[in-house]
Amino acid sequence: MKKKKEMKGMTKQTKYAGTQTEKNLETAFAGESQARNKYTYFASVAKKQGFEQIAALFLKTADNEKEHAKMWFKELAGIGDTAENLAAAAEGENYEWTDMYEGFAKTAEAEGFPELAAKFRLVGEIEKHHEERYRALLHNVEAKEVFAKSDVKVWECRNCGHIEIGRASCR
């Protein structure tokens, strides 16, 4: 029988719960995710220095790392439907602003890094906004109000820029 797996921002069933394999999957996911971001940053530097080919290779490798991370995340049962993903994202953002960044800020202050503590708190405030945004979007999905509203709105096509004024988008 599968056990319930609880990671920050996701609660799903997984056959790996409580095993070293689960820890390995979490480490692999984190490592590939970090590598992707790192290579994206490196690409930006290479491009600014005029090394277009090196920048392109960093970006290509970053895309490879993204796919590796996705593979491990799927094994950890981390991808659901849009409503589940919004709920998981909101939970993760909540943890970040209520616990993680505040704890980091307190530690930074205690260790004599007040400027870093202020940055942690600033990012925590941004994470709070992210949680609110995800919860609002989740409400819209659950209320079936993504493409229709009870009052008149301005809708803009994200592809061609067409403007529609009304209670529903032209999709």
Predicted regions, residues:
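Non-heme di-metal
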Residues: 2-171
